[in-house]
């Protein structure tokens, strides 16, 4: 019975890691989207301050702050069940998702070197999770 409880906790902790990854990716994509929508960074000091304040208090950007906070809460929950050296490599999967989704949503180039890098990241996560 204890084994089943511990196994259930590990499964939940993996879900916490997944939630951390997805919430982090959401925050990054929304932040990029809204910064791009705000336009180019102004030259003048006062214009820069106003630009940053406008982006800072944008509702979508605020949602990215909230999801980043939620991601950190899920991360804390995951770390109650796993060693940091086991859990942390999974966070690198955010690079994979951000690369793919930035290609889809922002039409950023997905080049061969980027694909190779992503494959190496995934291989590293697989190897790291086995050890």
Where would I find each of the regions flagged by the language model?
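C-terminal transmembrane-helix exit sites in multi-pass transporters
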Residues: 96-114
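Hydrophobic/small/kink-forming positions within alpha-helical transmembrane segments
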Residues: 21, 25, 69, 95-96, ...
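Loop-to-transmembrane-helix transition segments
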Residues: 13-19, 50-70
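Hydrophobic/aromatic residues within transmembrane alpha-helices
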Residues: 34, 78, 104-106
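Structural motif at transmembrane-helix junctions in multi-pass transporters
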Residues: 72-93
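Hydrophobic residues within alpha-helical transmembrane segments
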Residues: 19, 62, 66, 92-93, ...
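Glycine-/small-residue-enriched transmembrane alpha-helix faces in small-molecule transporters
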Residues: 2-38
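Hydrophobic transmembrane alpha-helices of multi-pass small-molecule transport proteins
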Residues: 113-130
């Amino acid at each position: 019975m204890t084994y089943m409880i511990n196994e259930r906790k590990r499964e939940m902790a993996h879900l916490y890691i997944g939630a951390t990854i997805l919430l982090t990716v959401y925050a990054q994509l929304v932040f990029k989207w809204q910064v791009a929508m705000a336009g180019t960074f102004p030259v003048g000091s006062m214009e820069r301050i106003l630009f940053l304040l406008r982006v800072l208090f944008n509702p979508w950007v605020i949602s990215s702050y909230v999801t980043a906070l939620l991601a950190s809460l899920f991360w804390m929950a995951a770390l109650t069940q796993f060693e940091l050296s086991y859990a942390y490599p999974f966070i690198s999967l955010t690079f994979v998702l951000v690369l793919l989704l930035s290609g889809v949503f922002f039409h950023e180039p997905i080049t061969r070197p980027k694909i190779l890098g992503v494959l190496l990241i995934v291989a590293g996560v697989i190897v790291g999770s086995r050890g």
